[in-house]
């Protein structure tokens, strides 16, 4: 099933939590906390055509009580507002991480860094 987030939202699949502690103790499913990181599976048109700071495939960190959980085809996802994303794991700058040129920005003023500095 295809899902297209609206507004400034992203669809995220949570990363799996470890089943063992560092000392080897197995953690039962009901005792695990849900991870606060996930992989972006879809972004809204407003983000993909605007700031482009988050794209499909990015690993992001988000707040503990943020987003809305949904189930699509038996898989759990989170729908998060752009402002609820704390950061991108191993990210470069917006333009260079997304392989586009400054001249290609239609909405440079909405981007997450100052184009005049580059």
Curated annotation (Swiss-Prot):
It comes from the Bacteria. Gene3D superfamilies: GroES chaperonin. PROSITE patterns: CHAPERONINS_CPN10. InterPro entries: Chaperonin_GroES, Chaperonin_GroES_sf, Chaprnonin_Cpn10_CS, GroES-like_sf. The keyword Chaperone applies. One of its GO terms (cellular component) is cytoplasm. It is found in: Cytoplasm. One of its GO terms (molecular function) is protein-folding chaperone binding. GO terms for biological process: chaperone cofactor-dependent protein refolding. Together with the chaperonin GroEL, plays an essential role in assisting protein folding. The GroEL-GroES system forms a nano-cage that allows encapsulation of the non-native substrate proteins and provides a physical environment optimized to promote and accelerate protein folding. GroES binds to the apical surface of the GroEL ring, thereby capping the opening of the GroEL channel. Belongs to the GroES chaperonin family. This is Co-chaperonin GroES. It comes from Helicobacter acinonychis (strain Sheeba).
